[in-house]
């Protein structure tokens, strides 16, 4: 919130002691920024038990426009549609999060169908036409299929699923590696190249492979005179959130 602006908060709801908090309608207005929620139910531990509709239209702290909506189409099944979404802080939080400390945002398992015109990955890089779906079970994504475009020739895709042996398979392909790699400051001047990541996990044991092809590197930090496997391991650790081994670079 900007301390120099007036904020209006409109609430229509009620609270059941030691049970749920019900919002029939909740509206937050600040200049041209507005957030509208309908039929929002929060459980006793503040996790989301239900929401029928949510609309977001605001300029965030990075001066990026966010304009999207979430609509329930049937029980625990939602559509996320919109023109603009800034995912920069979300990506940073995911990369820095500890899975053991995962927050219980949702009370129930949900399906999220996504259709966003433009999504910013950081301050300058963005993707277009992000489409796909996520299946969230116990506040963890157990199934995913997302695709998007950098432009007409470059694309990015992300999947999570299970194979016949019940291994959790995660894949990430990006025909532009730079927007993902340059988040890690120990590598300087990274340019071009494409990225291919594969991970198989079962019983909390993960085997992963990260390939980055056809890239250019202008500068290395003093402590890494050559591009070592230790440095590569660092990228993979951040991508997966756990220790993994490199097969190829």
Task: Provide a role label for each language-model segment.
Residues 1-249:
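Membrane-proximal interfacial segments on either side of biological membranes
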